[in-house]
Amino acid sequence: MPTINQLIAKGREPAAKRNKVPALQGCPQKRGVCTRVYTTTPKKPNSALRKVAKVRLTNGYEVVSYIPGEGHNLQEHSVVLIRGGRVKDLPGVRYHILRGVLDTQGIAKRRQRRSLYGAKRPK
């Protein structure tokens, strides 16, 4: 336990905040190339085949990122843009792929929340 004089002299050092998306290096998005596109199963109690891709970023990091929405056109060597944002039931998946940008197609039939899925406004 420090004395008052020790606290006056040195003070308390605030705990460093842990970065949840280190691969982005402070950027809002990063570009990368898919090295593997596959499905994986979520943690209990959920059950599904979640679509994910291993992406090598321009800064050399290799991360696993989630492919949101129904259906996708991604394969190996597709160029994608990733953003931060984890998937709660997939351990180790801390990034999302942006739809409708670079090689990733948007979702054609999407009516609501279109901006998240790169969908054009329906006529």
Curated annotation (Swiss-Prot):
Coiled coil: none annotated. Pfam families: Ribosom_S12_S23. The modification 3-methylthioaspartic acid is found at D89. One of its GO terms (biological process) is translation. Gene3D superfamilies: Nucleic acid-binding proteins. One of its GO terms (cellular component) is small ribosomal subunit. Keywords: Methylation, Ribonucleoprotein, Ribosomal protein, RNA-binding, rRNA-binding, tRNA-binding. GO terms for molecular function: rRNA binding; structural constituent of ribosome; tRNA binding. It comes from the Bacteria. InterPro entries: NA-bd_OB-fold, Ribosomal_uS12, Ribosomal_uS12_bac. Part of the 30S ribosomal subunit. Contacts proteins S8 and S17. May interact with IF1 in the 30S initiation complex. Belongs to the universal ribosomal protein uS12 family. NCBIfam families: rpsL_bact (TIGR00981). With S4 and S5 plays an important role in translational accuracy. This is Small ribosomal subunit protein uS12.
